[in-house]
């Protein structure tokens, strides 16, 4: 199982939100590259980057920070947040970003998403964020009428091979993750590499996720608060 430490960007700063709430934001650093280097020194080979300004407003205000992270080297980098056009995908891939994550647009424009999956293959992942089991969009501000598991099936049928699934209720809450959900996804949507995201706060959870065949896990607040030690986690579960 691969581990993706997370860097969430707001106004160029490293931050974490609680349950996707922009009013419940904690700033953990002013320098994303310095934070990424700390992750590398702990043994990380992957990095999950979210442009929170992009997710909320569609802006490119964190573009320089993302460019600097991509230029740093030594990490497989996936980026999400506000990617709603092919132009934005090309922009990030040309920087050296390894994979772009489509979020809200996968719900609002499924045909576009299917085309991008066909055109770019494994360089596209889809982020599915669910609130009470239903897909949430636009920075988690709106909830759709479609169940997350059903949406994952549709994505798989469209050729999606990688889905980052977040249960919003668990995200940033430091109360554990929804293991039953990831077990269900592995069983009901075979053939998709799922990344678990939201609330992972113990080594036991990581081991359980690996055991059930989860492809990757994103670690956020648990690293910033010191609840988990990245070096030990990498040694424990990373391929």
Model-derived features: positions:
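Glycine/small-residue-rich loop that forms an oxyanion/phosphate-binding "nest" at active or ligand-binding sites
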Residues: 53, 61-118
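Conserved anion-binding
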Residues: 11-12, 19-23, 90, 97-171
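Glycine-rich phosphate-binding active-site loops on the catalytic face of alpha/beta enzymes
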Residues: 83, 94-112, 167-170, 198-202, ...
């Amino acid at each position: 199982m691969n581990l993706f430490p997370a860097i969430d960007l707001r106004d160029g700063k490293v931050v974490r939100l609680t349950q996707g709430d922009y009013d419940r934001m904690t700033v953990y650093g002013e320098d994303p590259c310095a934070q990424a280097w700390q992750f590398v020194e702990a043994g990380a080979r992957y990095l999950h980057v979210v442009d929170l300004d992009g997710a909320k407003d569609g802006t490119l205000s964190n573009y320089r920070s993302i460019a600097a992270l991509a230029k740093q080297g030594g990490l497989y980098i996936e980026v999400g947040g506000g990617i709603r056009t092919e132009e934005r995908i090309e922009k990030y891939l040309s920087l050296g970003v390894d994979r772009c994550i489509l979020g809200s647009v996968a719900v609002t424009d499924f045909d576009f998403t299917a085309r991008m999956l066909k055109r770019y293959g494994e360089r596209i992942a889809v982020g599915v964020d669910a609130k009470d089991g239903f897909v949430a969009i636009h920075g988690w501000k709106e909830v759709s009428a479609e169940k997350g598991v059903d949406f994952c099936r549709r994505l798989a049928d469209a050729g999606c091979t990688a889905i980052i699934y977040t249960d919003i209720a668990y995200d940033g809450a430091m109360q554990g993750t929804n293991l039953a959900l990831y077990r269900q996804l592995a069983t009901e949507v075979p053939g998709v590499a799922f990344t678990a995201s939201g609330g992972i706060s113990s080594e036991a959870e990581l081991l359980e996720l690996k055991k059930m065949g989860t492809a990757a896990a994103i670690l956020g607040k648990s690293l910033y608060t010191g609840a988990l030690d990245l070096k030990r986690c990498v040694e424990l579960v990373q391929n």
